[in-house]
């Protein structure tokens, strides 16, 4: 009888835990083979081969025109990068890292005697929805939190991301 009672309590506990809203989603669709960001249009596309799987509205760095060169310039990088990691503990809901700076970015900044910056991400907007409109990040790509949950589940490490002006 004691065993049945424990089993029942565990079943209830797991059942209630499963009812909670989780920011971690499961994606079982086609592999995202590339990401394209079109800064001028404020759009991001997740693509499988030649098929656009998803399209998102984005916000960029607070000084978005041009390629990121230095720490604090407020620009979002341009060029080819890779998804470097997933961060489930981001202060912006969830985030995935972008491999900025690359070798060329680093060489240019060092040649100028400056820091290229880093920690560029695709992330959510937690607590920034009402305070900031338009481009507000330090150089990252921001999307709505619900969209970020979807993107987080769809992207894999080393997925190429092409960021166009």
Show which residues each predicted segment covers.
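Bacterial signal peptide processing site
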Residues: 20-22
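Sec-dependent signal peptide recognition
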Residues: 2-9
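C-terminal motif of bacterial Sec signal peptides marking the signal peptidase cleavage site
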Residues: 15-18
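Short, surface-exposed loop/turn motifs at beta-strand boundaries within globular domains
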Residues: 28-30, 37-39, 51, 76, ...
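Short glycine- and Lys/Arg-enriched binding-loop motifs that mark or flank ligand-binding interfaces
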Residues: 57, 68, 75, 120, ...
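Post-signal-peptide N-terminal segment of Sec-exported extracytoplasmic proteins
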Residues: 35-66
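Exported/periplasmic cell-wall-interacting domains
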Residues: 24, 30, 80, 85-165
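Short, surface-exposed secondary-structure junctions/capping segments
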Residues: 66-83
